């Protein structure tokens, strides 16, 4: 007797649910906070933007190609397990190389402490004040480096420098510190950063002593000869690159003057990130495709659309867990390990846990090649229909603007003295608000038409960007994150709904994946490249305001163009396969709910006889 293989759908979905959950816990322990690590390395906004731009570009090109190769050679499980193992290893490598400077880690860590503790930073800072109330700060001389995270306070007046000849002076400040959003590069081996005295602010603390006056009389002429290219705002500080120094021991010969240390650090990080993304990018794409094919084989694809919920729950839990852990650690734990490295350790740990689940992950080896044909057909369909073209441009803009939030929002929060816990909570609030609104999705789709749902989503994102440019306190970001339900949820529900109406039978999912690929690949890559240079030229606030204006202009264009495009729905007969037998009734009430009858009515109403 030949035994028939049993398909345990419940077990398969349970394993897939745990896989999605733990993978997203690990992913959100690190990925949203990677930008803070790059900032502690001393990389300026343009360099960070380039790194993220290449990261998205690699994902854009490599993930679908690797998925195709895995499917062709029936090696999906091998690719999934290899991706988990190697990406965990390469990600954890950042905790050891390139090394962080302890002084800089201390100063960035210092902003997360209560304000009273911020007054006593863990390193010695030399301070001098001249007769014009220009205050100068200097880092210890034994490291020969600037403290790039030293802050210009809202009430501070004066100049920031690193001259070792300056004398120490007690400094009493009653306002919290703020961090920079720009890292200008100079050619000095020991950098100086000066800020103009803001007279008449009413908040300046006058610090004078006979010792500082004597010291500054000797330093005044040399300091006045060095002017900063940046004029400081009372609420924004600008700092030099924290890696602009004589020597940085990272195993590279720094005697070569063709590149300054900051750019050498940048090249090392860029190469590591590209390798990391090559290893990590195929994971989600291959896992999602494999699970969908498995459920398609057992006629249970309707249950595939709910698994993202567990991914969101895992992401929310991961972001809160890691930030709560990091905020409750000292700046340096055992063996002087900076607490920021725990992001990498937790990322690697959860991915290793997910690796064990991948051995049971449901995968169906199909010999059909129609999947690749559907993907090619979906990509070709992007340019064949005016409505899809307009939708593609919209999601491209959505990805470009969204990347600015992912890359630099935490910089803006850090500038107002936010701890990492508020950052983690902001992620969780955004995801959970979207998840909550999902249960009212069908009602929204009935109330609003496609164009108004897209306009609502774009408008919500524009309001968020404008709000980000005026953050005044660490907690202030939490309220606006509720709009993520509209800027990320509603707009994609509307787009997916339209794709179902427009796509040819069997290509709906492929077209939806193509649009997300366009948004989070092309759009995010372009937005990352551009946003870093905008921040360098202007500021973070200007970047978010520009994003808001761009979104409002696109809303107007979208509302004007979309109604003029042909609006004839295609009858998707493949949907009849999913119809329940109870829908085949001959009663008038059941006929009204019959999908084919409804589609025929819609088609007749769109004809002009």
Swiss-Prot record:
Pfam families xref list: MFS_1_like
SUPFAM superfamilies on file: MFS general substrate transporter (SSF103473)
Keywords: Membrane, Transmembrane, Transmembrane helix
Annotated membrane topology: Multi-pass membrane protein
Region of interest (Disordered), residue spans: 201-241
Annotated Polar residues bias: 207-230
Compartments where located: Membrane
Keyword Transmembrane helix: yes
Transmembrane segments: 41-61, 78-98, 265-285, 307-327, 340-360, 388-408, 420-440, 452-472, 475-495, 513-535, 541-561
Subcellular location, principal: membrane
One Gene Ontology CC term in the entry: membrane
PANTHER family referenced in this protein's UniProt entry, alphabetically: MAJOR FACILITATOR SUPERFAMILY DOMAIN-CONTAINING PROTEIN 6-LIKE (PTHR16172:SF41)
Family affiliation: Belongs to the major facilitator superfamily. MFSD6 family.
Stated name of the protein: Major facilitator superfamily domain-containing protein 6-like protein A
